[in-house]
Amino acid sequence: MVFKNKNSNLNLAKDITQRAREYFYCAYFPKVAATRIVKQIKWERPARGWVKLNTDGSSLGNPGLAGGVGVIQDEEGNWIVGFARNIGITTSFQAELWGLRDGLTLCVECNFSAVEVELDARSVLDVITSPVCSNSLITSLVDDCKQLATRIPWISFKHCYREANWSTHKLARMGAVQESPFVIFLSPPVDVTRVFSSDMLGVFFSRECLEFVFSA
């Protein structure tokens, strides 16, 4: 939903999913004790000889105007290339998949042989690592991502917290509202410069997380 002169919550769907997961554990595992802890989160550089691909997606309304984005950085954290796609009207979940597919496509086109993929959408990681996709609406996107991944000799997929994905998070809104269908950024755009500099400096961000303790 979009309100005039007000920014819609781009993370509403993710927040709802996280709260639903917390409810599930509390409702179906009554012997699970949940403790809130504060973690210090930052963007981590890839291993030597690897590049890191961070991707993200957002939908202004879910479904609504959507964008899929990503950033590729080298082992020193330097910006190699970024991108933003205006997808049109779709869900945040599909926008995340578009961002991942575009990012993997760029990695293949650039002949990167070792790629660490990070994104903050655990549900996307679940469908990418699952042998079967039962949702016909996303089958082609998922298949494309899997096929592209096979063309990269060394590749890993990892979930990260939003605080470790700030640069792409900032890009996400740009993708949803930009006029061009697809834009390549050879350097950080102005709206991303500040958070990208924080990543390069290794700045930590605090995040309150739930830690589950299972009792017998």
Where are these regions (language model features)?
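Primary recognition of RNase H-like, Mg2+-dependent phosphodiesterase/nuclease domains
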Residues: 1-216
